[in-house]
């Protein structure tokens, strides 16, 4: 399958903004406050949503003709962050504290994705090794998160040297260009065994997914 992408919607799925209008009965946040915006608003009714897995909502993309019901994915099934004004469910908003710039706040949800994968789902323990495949925004922030959690070594693979360089700046201990080396063999050499403790696949490339497995 594929994403139910609709070209009529303005893109931008992880972003921040300033609240300029509130819906009826909204009192959790105030006008003028800065917020980071999570991509998904689940329908709240299907089995997945009731289990807390709203990013896999069974009603993905079905708005039922209303902003108040149905699943929405910013930039995919409703207008996203590149529009001037966007309507978002209160459950998708994260208040941005003072001291964090707008530019930094834009990365809150992306960093949260990496943190959730490594810490909550993965249960990473300091001293365990991590390979991150793909040096895009989530992959690069996964490097920073892994280092913060005490992972060692932290290895980044990509096919672009500029992304590998950014990865080193963010804390990657080792970087591998997948065009130049056999990543699986190199990781086995580095680990001195079958491989690393964790692989976080962030590229979406079929080859990288197979190698991660």
Residue ranges of each PLM-predicted region?
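Short SAM/SAH-binding signature in class I
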Residues: 194-200
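Short, well-ordered coil/turn residues at beta-beta hairpins
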Residues: 38, 200-202
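Cysteine-cluster motifs in flexible loop/terminal segments that predominantly coordinate metals
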Residues: 28, 38-92
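Conserved acidic residues
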Residues: 33, 84, 173, 197
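Mid-domain Rossmann-like dinucleotide-binding core that forms the NAD(H)/NADP(H) cofactor-binding site
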Residues: 91-93, 97-181, 185, 198
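Rossmann-fold NAD(P) dinucleotide-binding segment
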Residues: 206-213
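Conserved amphipathic alpha-helix within the SDR
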Residues: 183-193
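Glycine-rich beta-strand-centered segment in the early N-terminal region that forms part
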Residues: 2-50, 55, 97-99
